[in-house]
């Protein structure tokens, strides 16, 4: 039977860890310094910096473009070691690339989805394909990043796209309970209550984006103090929490026109589901998309519930194949949660392998 000294010796490492973590969270720089996957800047321009992950200059694996959503830091695909889809793809033999839109300012208020669908994303796809001797590029988009990827592929059938993966991307907005009150009001008022104030300031400011995201994870925010106390001895768990907090705090804002399009065409009009999104004066139909598509929905995602994501299977009537998978996790958890490796990432691995382009290397 252990005496007091024995008990102290047994629990000492745990107590020391808890003390270090408590200090780091309260007075220090956190419990862990986040290490990002090495990357190289390939090209740069306004809201279109393109990075390639990996230390080698010569791309060797199948090209994959990670497309972030609007109003979200591009770090969503590379939060830290263990929470990095980019690192996972790289270690799996792919060559992952990342678009970074940077910060949205008042001067960007006129940027709508067409800026990405007709310009920024196609330019990145062509650049990457050229680096790989013309090989088609696999697109992976989380949330609205998936929306923009799907619209890009639908609008530009000539682009060298191998496949598209949409993670937590809602298609049927009537299946999102959180916005039901807004849709009800919108039947009588249109998008004016949602967009009138943002039009004055040129978009949805970053603080409002950050606050709205926290509201969707209200239970997490309320229970966070208890969560920290219960896990003071678990550095990995706290580091995951900390990486998410930093990610949320770095969310940029929406440009005014894009936010208006989200309200009018996606939330109120449900135009993705009705297969009729209008950008730059012409109609884009998801049914025109021909490449293979993987869609992943989160079982606890309140921003894009399962039913809203699964609706993609009835809309993409022209796609070569449409695969839908359920994965445990919240909206961000689908991409960077503790179960992502064995669910979302595993689905992506299988899908990319099944749809790998034939031409994959350079000299």
Annotate each predicted stretch with a short phrase:
Residues 328-343:
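Catalytic histidine-centered segment of alpha/beta-hydrolase-like enzymes
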Residues 110-131:
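Alpha/beta-hydrolase active-site loop
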